[in-house]
Amino acid sequence: MKPQHSTGTLSYTIATYEQVAAILLEDDDDDDDDETDDTNHLVDAVVTCFFIDTATNIYDWVALTHDIVAPGGVWINVGPLQWHRNARLPVTANQLRMILERTGWDILEWSIDPEPIEYRNSQRSTTSGRTAATMSTHFDAYCPLRFVARKP
């Protein structure tokens, strides 16, 4: 892969989720040991934080995650479902749960925080000393989805 960004002697490439999963799933052609199995490159856990709503196609990401997690492994997630512009399938939390279950995940924990969490340096404040006139009436917030799912 050719570096996408460089500064002086430092360069780096940002891989997509699909590229990272492909590395985990690729066969090791140099290994002729018949005692190895298909779970050599699988992981015991995947943790996604403020991530899944960046998917263009969440169905693909759920299937990929299922493919890279070893049997008995878990997927832990926390973050909003504020789908980015490039999302072709912006699903609700309930729809996402159905997708996970139909893909073969067992849901161990599932919750949506009841209180919204503000972000983007909101000007909204309840600090004493600020008048209502100086407080913004607009703020960005989300209620994070938290789940733990296990691959049987």
What do these predicted regions represent?
Residues 103, 119-152:
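Core SAM-dependent methyltransferase catalytic element
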